[in-house]
């Protein structure tokens, strides 16, 4: 059928991918489409494996178009020094912050990353900023990012500078992390109910949460051989 690509035919696939690159270049540079520039950067990264060109397009799309997804991707490049960029956590933090605040497909991931970098302290002269970390973990947790919910539970479980210990909030965020599939969220909530640690003791809930943690752990082990580490 006309228009369909035979993906078993190497020449057809090559022509298709070349045309795709041309189309995305036109969208980006001629039509000035921010989404087109983001697609072009992804094309260079995923198809051509040309990370330097991808980084260049991402910078253009951030500087000229303030594209949320490109800010997220550029931030990830700065974290690892990808595409010939220097490892620069402050630049990464700035990119993630802009992506988080602008909204978009990767904004929740970006909010979580802002929390991680603020918590780490290396973007603030080696001084951890627990309050900023909490605020951005909250944004990500509100968007159902399980790891941020768990990090909030750990923060309230232990307390931090500017954040008093709060066992009720620790339990709330542990249970939310658990509901989103975070094994340790389930395990921590189970332990709190089992020991009556700052909350009313409840053996039934403790057992239920422990079983969910076990089930999630088993599911993760079954999936692990098929998962490769991404960015």
From Swiss-Prot:
Primary localization class, coarse: mitochondrion
Gene that encodes it: coa7-a
Domain of life where this protein originates: Eukaryota
Keyword Mitochondrion: yes
Localization (cell): Mitochondrion intermembrane space
Any Pfam family hit: Sel1
Full protein name: Cytochrome c oxidase assembly factor 7A
One GO cellular component term: mitochondrial intermembrane space
InterPro entries (alphabetical): HcpB-like, Sel1-like, TPR-like_helical_dom_sf
SMART domains per record: SEL1
Family indicated by similarity: Belongs to the hcp beta-lactamase family.
SUPFAM superfamilies found in the cross-reference section: HCP-like
Keywords assigned by UniProt, alphabetized: Mitochondrion, Repeat
Role summary: May be required for assembly of mitochondrial respiratory chain complexes.
Coiled coil: none
Sel1-like repeats: 34-66, 68-104, 108-145, 146-182, 183-218
